[in-house]
């Protein structure tokens, strides 16, 4: 770029040239109510009520309707400011693989109840009072086009439960043993990966390190409009935090064989169902690539697309050992992520994934 262009851009007189526009979907302010109730010790019932006047179809993936051991609740021990560490999985799914069996219809006035045992994904062996809540967004799907039409944000009541640790000591043990087993045997060269898979992973990590590095710089000194589009704020302290996370991800990605995260290519947790690209095992610093990962585009060219390197960013953002606190999955896909508020955005993995892509693709903030 010539000096004159630099000066004009800095002065705000010459707008940058963008590859395409970023377009956000609608955010519905009402229509679903979420309430939590205790059903005994570590078990919690979730009741989702459609308070609107028409039937809607909710995407199950990464929501309270997802049967996978994904993060659905925020849990604190009373008197502590530190969240109880999550021991389940964070999944990355392909938005192009939506199907009817991924939808949860709910009619007007209808309530759907789901029961979860918190001890299956949290270590609640210490007796006492715990505070449980849930927040996020429900992606609403157009059943004709199978695309996300809008999102409905939700925030549950705050529930206090009394836990007897002696009753739950064995609940997490089976899953924990699998985690420990994978953590001990999974590394870049010994995770049941073929030579082809190793080559794909190594290439994706190299690209990820560069993409995350660019995003780290952009978060601090790049176009503030693009940052605000994904993180809903221009607060300098938040920009610094986002930059620091990307910097940590970049460093981890360039340390494929010496980093804290290990790669596994065999799905011993049995969660690589259709549409699941990869998942992170929380507490074990293990990322598992599902078979579909190797058919995902290596390098995307669109502002709202994903690829192998962006999947790496998504999964590494979930690992506490890379950057604390780790992200979670509050929204699915770019459109739903851009409908989050500032507090949710900074905690949401896909907000980082698609911001990094927007920086790389030079996408235009709408």
Swiss-Prot record:
EC identifiers of the protein: 3.4.24.39
Signal peptide: 1-19
Residues at the catalytic site: 315
Glycosylation sites: 123, 192
Residues where Zn(2+) binds: 314, 318
Proregion positions: 23-184
Cofactor(s) the protein requires to work: Zn(2+)
GO cellular component, one term: extracellular region
Superkingdom of the organism of origin: Eukaryota
Reaction catalysis annotation: Preferential cleavage of bonds with hydrophobic residues in P1'. Also 3-Asn-|-Gln-4 and 8-Gly-|-Ser-9 bonds in insulin B chain
Disulfide bond positions: 272-290
Subcellular location: Secreted
Keywords assigned by UniProt, alphabetized: Cleavage on pair of basic residues, Disulfide bond, Glycoprotein, Hydrolase, Metal-binding, Metalloprotease, Protease, Secreted, Signal, Zinc, Zymogen
UniProt-listed Pfam families: Peptidase_M35 (PF02102)
Cofactor binding notes: Binds 1 zinc ion per subunit.
InterPro entries according to UniProt: Fungal_M35_metalloproteases, Lys_MEP, MetalloPept_cat_dom_sf, Peptidase_M35
UniProt keyword Coiled coil present: no
Gene Ontology biological-process annotations: proteolysis
Any one Gene Ontology molecular-function term assigned to this protein's record: metalloendopeptidase activity
Family, as annotated: Belongs to the peptidase M35 family.
Function, in words: Secreted metalloproteinase that allows assimilation of proteinaceous substrates. Shows high activities on basic nuclear substrates such as histone and protamine.
Protein name: Neutral protease 2 homolog BDBG_02110
Originating organism: Blastomyces gilchristii (strain SLH14081) (Blastomyces dermatitidis)
Lineage, top ranks: Eukaryota, Fungi, Dikarya, Ascomycota, Pezizomycotina
């Amino acid at each position: 770029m010539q000096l004159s262009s630099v000066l004009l851009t800095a002065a705000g007189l010459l707008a940058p040239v963008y590859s395409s526009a970023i377009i956000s979907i609608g955010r519905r302010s009402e229509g679903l109510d979420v309430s939590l109730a205790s059903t005994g010790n570590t078990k919690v019932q979730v009741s989702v009520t459609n308070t609107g006047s028409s039937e809607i179809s909710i995407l199950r993936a990464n929501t309270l309707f997802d049967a996978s051991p994904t993060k659905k609740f925020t849990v604190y021990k009373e008197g502590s400011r530190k969240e109880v560490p999550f021991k389940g999985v964070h999944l990355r799914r392909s938005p192009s693989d939506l199907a009817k069996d991924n939808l949860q219809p709910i009619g007007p006035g209808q309530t759907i109840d789901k029961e979860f045992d918190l001890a299956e994904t949290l270590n609640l062996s210490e007796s006492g009072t715990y505070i449980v809540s849930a927040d996020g967004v429900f992606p609403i799907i157009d059943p004709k086009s199978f695309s996300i039409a809008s999102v409905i944000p939700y925030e549950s009541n705050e529930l206090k439960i009394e836990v007897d640790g002696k009753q739950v000591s064995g609940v997490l043990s089976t899953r924990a043993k699998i985690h420990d087993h994978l953590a001990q045997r999974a590394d870049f060269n010994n995770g049941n990966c073929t030579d082809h898979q190793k080559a794909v992973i190594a290439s994706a990590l190299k690209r990820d390190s560069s993409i995350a590095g660019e995003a780290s710089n952009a978060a601090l000194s790049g176009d503030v409009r693009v940052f605000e589009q994904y993180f809903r704020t221009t607060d300098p302290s938040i920009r610094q935090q986002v930059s620091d996370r990307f910097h940590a991800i970049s460093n981890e990605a360039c340390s494929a064989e010496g980093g804290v995260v290990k790669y596994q290519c065999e799905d011993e947790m049995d969660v690589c169902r259709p549409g699941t690209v990869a998942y992170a095992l929380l507490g074990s610093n293990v990322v598992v690539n599902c078979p579909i990962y190797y058919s995902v585009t290596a390098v995307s060219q669109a502002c709202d697309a994903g690829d192998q390197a962006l999947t790496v960013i998504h999964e590494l953002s979930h690992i506490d050992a890379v950057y604390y606190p780790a992200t979670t999955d509050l929204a699915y896909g770019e459109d739903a992520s851009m409908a989050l508020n500032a507090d949710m955005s900074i905690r949401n993995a896909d907000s980082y994934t698609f911001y990094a892509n927007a920086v790389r693709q030079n996408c235009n903030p709408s």
